[in-house]
UniProtKB/Swiss-Prot annotation:
It comes from the Bacteria. The gene is yfjO. S-adenosyl-L-methionine binds at residues 296, 325, 346, 394. Belongs to the class I-like SAM-binding methyltransferase superfamily. RNA M5U methyltransferase family. [4Fe-4S] cluster binds at residues 82, 88, 91, 172. The active site is at 421 (nucleophile). This is Uncharacterized RNA methyltransferase YfjO.
Amino acid sequence: MNQQKKQAPVELKVGQTFPLTIKRLGINGEGVGYFKKKVVFVPGALPGEEVVVQATKVQPKFSEGRIKKIRKASEHRVAPPCPVYEQCGGCQLQHLAYSQQLREKRDIVIQSLERHTKFKVENMEIKETIGMDNPWNYRNKSQFQIGRSQSGSIIAGLYGLDSHDIVPIKDCIVQHPATNKTTGIVRRILEDFNVSVYNERKRKGDVRTIVTRVGFETGEVQVVLVTAKETLPHKEEIVKAIQKRLPEVKSIIQNVNGAKTSVIFGEKTKQLAGKTVIQEVLGDVSFELSARAFFQLNPEQTVKLYDEVKKAAQLTGKEKVVDAYCGVGTIGMWVADGAKEVRGMDVIKESIDDAKKNAKKHGMANATYVTGTAEHWLPKWTKEGFRPDVVIVDPPRTGCDSTFLDTIKKVKPKRFVYVSCNPSTLAKDLQTLSKDYRVDYIQPVDMFPQTAHVEAVARLVLKSSN
């Protein structure tokens, strides 16, 4: 019998060029298209564009490529204003007009729901993304690696895209100007004293990183020098030079990190001069920020985010509220004036100490904070007669712990407010809760303009059958 041979599918090879139409943006800001029904990720490509792509990586389930030529450009494509945008890995969307960034971020939330849930997404209320009037100079903290240029001078910047070569940055346009100014002057001071720069490959040298944080409302600046060893030659002279040339610096700290790691901070922190903290104000609440304290990086958008949390909680003054994964207590304190009682917990003792201090300083007698997990405290409090009406959660990128979600299903608060920094884990967690809770709406918030990140506030309401 003369059987017809089945044609083998066309396989892509690394280096091959091929045409591609970009259908959407991926969760990391890359363009997504399909070649012979296989997904292809192309950094820098935008939805609606027709491009010629060269394959850089070919896997069984997906491929990656780079743009060789744009045949038809998106009407939303703009020239990125940053001179090192192509080399630096910090921003992903400067080449996309800001109004369209906001639309695409809403779409990323929708895509995550379509991929990870069984919801009829077309019937859900996914609100327009809340953006910024000026989507630049918004970051209150910079962490610039220190290295040496080919000519031998000290440089400060970020690691390049997919590399461990430092891209020198003099004026990062998403950073607050005070952090740029401070980092630049500290870099020159280190050069004046010919400080030894840490070499990652050889694991030798002294200074690794300059970390700068500014209080937007107070103008106070903190400088942290991350060193590989406890000894820092010319320490006193460096401190004096910083104080003389940067009077706005109120806190100078040394952090010691000798480990072979990409994590910035080590465990040991030493005060070199000034205060151990700087002050920052959000709305009517002020905070003391130590070198390693977590604090939102975009104060202007944080106020909008927390106002959305308050709106979603719908407080009347009678509710018992739990702030899970509470950190230094920011969200709980933001909503405390509308609640009967707020209780927060976190596994990091230092954060809880800060939360207690912050609540006491503001005279919030209705806010209490404890160390431990929500899985431990929620059932215990419920047994003791404290049944929360509202639970607010702001988990890390990995989403909520499954035991925490099981606890929510048992305790059954009337309202559950989920603050997410990762649409994929948000969608998965909403699906897990879908038997007991309906999603009232989701409000995306743009905390990091020019990047692919999107935050969202989801309001869940207990189903009446419960």
